[in-house]
């Protein structure tokens, strides 16, 4: 697991989410050293942001497809 400031785009949403879940479990367990926990937290933030970005991209793509399928569709604001 690399702790770069950005995530590579070749990781899938599912892989990022799975890694984020593992980080949360490890931090909640409280068995890591402070330094390791901080590094894990930093990686977790990157993964969270990446997952949010992917979800937003998917939502926008679905909205675009829906608009193309029916130009009269009214889209409601949704929170990601």
Curated annotation (Swiss-Prot):
Intrachain disulfide bonds: none
Subcellular location, record wording: Cytoplasm
Main location: cytoplasm
UniProt-listed Enzyme Commission number(s): 3.1.11.6
Pfam family, any one: Exonuc_VII_S
EC top class named in words: hydrolase
InterPro entries: Exonuc_VII_S, Exonuc_VII_ssu_sf
GO biological process entries: DNA catabolic process
Assigned keywords, A-Z: Cytoplasm, Exonuclease, Hydrolase, Nuclease
UniProt catalytic activity: Exonucleolytic cleavage in either 5'- to 3'- or 3'- to 5'-direction to yield nucleoside 5'-phosphates
Listed GO CC annotations: cytosol; exodeoxyribonuclease VII complex
MF annotations from Gene Ontology: exodeoxyribonuclease VII activity
Family: Belongs to the XseB family.
Role this protein plays: Bidirectionally degrades single-stranded DNA into large acid-insoluble oligonucleotides, which are then degraded further into small acid-soluble oligonucleotides.
Quaternary structure and partners: Heterooligomer composed of large and small subunits.
Name of the featured protein: Exodeoxyribonuclease 7 small subunit
Organism of derivation: Rickettsia typhi (strain ATCC VR-144 / Wilmington)
């Amino acid at each position: 697991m690399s702790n770069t400031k950005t995530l590579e785009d070749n990781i899938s949403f599912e892989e990022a989410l799975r890694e984020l879940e593992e980080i949360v479990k490890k931090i909640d367990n409280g068995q890591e050293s402070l330094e390791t926990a901080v590094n894990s937290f930093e990686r977790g933030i990157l993964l969270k942001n990446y997952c949010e970005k992917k979800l937003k991209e998917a939502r926008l793509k679905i909205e675009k497809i829906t608009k193309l399928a029916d130009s009269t569709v009214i889209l409601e604001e949704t929170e990601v």
